[in-house]
Structure formats: C-alpha cells, structure tokens
C-alpha cells in the first residue's frame, strides 16, 4: 500500500510539472507577441525620426518615459537590431543623439532589480552609446554597479566602462574589484 501511495504522489508531481510547462509555453507566446508588437511600434517611430534626421525634445521625452520599463527597452533593442542593417550610419547617428535619454535612464535603472540593472549596461555597451565620452554621473553609477553582488551586473558595468575608454574610471573599477 505504501508503494502505491508513493507512485500516485510521483504521478501527481509529474502531471503538475507537465501542466506548469504547458502554462509557461502559453505565457511566453503571449509575451513574445507583445514584444513583437512593441518592437514594430518602435520601428515605425525610430524609422520616421531617422528619415527626418532630427531627434526632437518631444521624441526624447517619449523615449525617456517608455524606456523606463524593461519590456519597452527590450522592444527598443529589437527595433534597433532590425534597423541597423538597413541604415547603419543613420541609426548610429540617431543613437548618439539619444545620449541625454540614456543618461536619464541610467539613473532610473540604477534603482531597478539586479536583472534589469544588468540588462541596461548591456544595451549601453551594445550600441556604444557613451563611447569616447565619459560622462561623470553615468560613470559614477556604473562604478556603483561594479559594487553589486550580482556577477552579471558587475560584468556588464565593467564592459561599459572599458568600452567608454576612460583610463581613470577603468582604474577605479579595478580598485573596487580588488577590494
């Protein structure tokens, strides 16, 4: 009798795991569709701004508001990935003009969870947003992220610091890691 109870318990656990996996599949499909929808919206907006060749203050405010949410930042990243092969020079110019937006977002993502805080420096590094221009407040926040207990946050923050090219900030980051 005890063996039968154990088998039924094992069967119930297996059924629960299968149910959980099926539910996850549906949830991830919905999230992927939502991400694609947001990405298409960003593609239209960014493509229009690139064609006009001017980033307006209104557009910067819109992005500052929208990109505070991690799902919108992921959709924006996906949109830029699609636009880069089509117009590499114009897209780079567009991203350079958004440095004020990314300075603001640096302050916002500093307050977020570790996973979100790790993703934001990845975006900065990926598109080389602050390359060659070490901005004080951004560098201070990146150095704070180097203190993080999360390996992903530290790694991405260090990669951004290295890509910016500031010797002083790189040395400070190495001192922080050494402690």
Where are these predicted regions, by residue range?
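Buried hydrophobic core positions in alpha-solenoid tandem helical repeats
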Residues: 104-107, 141-143, 172-176
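Acidic, Ser/Thr-rich low-complexity segments on the non-lumenal side of membrane proteins
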Residues: 51-81
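Short inter-helical turns and helix N-cap capping residues of alpha-solenoid HEAT/ARM repeat scaffolds
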Residues: 112-113, 149-151, 179
């Amino acid at each position: 009798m005890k063996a039968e109870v154990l088998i039924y318990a094992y069967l119930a656990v297996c059924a629960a795991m299968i149910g959980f996996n099926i539910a996850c599949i549906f949830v991830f499909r919905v999230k992927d569709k939502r991400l694609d929808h947001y990405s298409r919206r960003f593609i239209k907006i960014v493509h229009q701004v690139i064609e006009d060749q001017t980033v307006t203050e209104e557009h910067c405010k819109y992005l500052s508001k929208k990109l505070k949410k991690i799902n919108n930042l992921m959709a924006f990243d996906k949109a830029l990935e699609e636009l880069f092969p089509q117009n590499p020079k114009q897209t780079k110019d567009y991203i350079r003009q958004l440095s004020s937006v990314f300075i603001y977002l640096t302050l916002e993502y500093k307050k977020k969870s570790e996973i979100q805080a790790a993703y934001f420096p990845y975006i900065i590094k990926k598109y080389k947003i602050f390359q060659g221009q070490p901005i004080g407040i951004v560098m201070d926040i990146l150095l704070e992220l180097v203190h993080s207990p999360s390996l992903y946050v530290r790694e991405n923050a260090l990669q951004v610091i290295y890509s910016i090219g500031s010797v002083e900030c790189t040395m400070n980051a190495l001192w922080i890691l050494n402690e």
